[in-house]
Each structure stands twice: as structure tokens, then as C-alpha cells.
Amino acid sequence: MFGLFGKKPDFMALLQEAKEKKGAVVIDVREPDEYIQGHVPGSINIPTSQINTVNYEKDTPLYLYCLSGGRSKMAMGFLEQKGFQNVKNMGAIGQYRGELEK
């Protein structure tokens, strides 16, 4: 499926890829109040406003998501500018098929 800005990320395929990739980190870039309402199990919360605090090796596989995919796309661009080499935008949490953790 193609959106206004090209192909939409395949959330579930990228989540599976993250689970299979050694050392991968799934990051929910929404605000803490959004995160506690429900998030992908195993994900951590680093809001877009604090993405500059990411303290991983530059080659760590990072998988980002948010409510619509916009904030995660912005965070991905920031991390890439900071030299992170393996960052992927998973897109919107609404594409997640499973039980959310609270």
C-alpha cells in the first residue's frame, strides 16, 4: 500500500525482524502518557523530545514507532544525522496486531 509519501512501513514484518535481530531495540517515541495507555510488549519509551538521549552503539538496530508514523520518521532522521546506521521506522502502532502491554 502506498501513502502520500511513498510505501508505508510494514509494522508487523519489521517487528518480527527486530525480534530476530540480535541486540535490536524497539523504541516507542510517543509521550509517556501515550506509552502507558498501551505499547508493544518489549518496547521502551524514549519520546521524540528526548531522542537525543539515545545512548546505544551507532550500529545498534533501532526500530521506532509512534501513533501515526510521523514522529518516528522524524526521530529516525535525527538519529541518522547523529550517525546511527541501522534505524528503521516501523510506522503506526495502529498496525500492530496483538495485545498491547500497559
What are these regions (language model features)?
Residues 2-25, 31-61, 70-102:
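Rhodanese-like catalytic fold shared by cysteine-dependent sulfurtransferases
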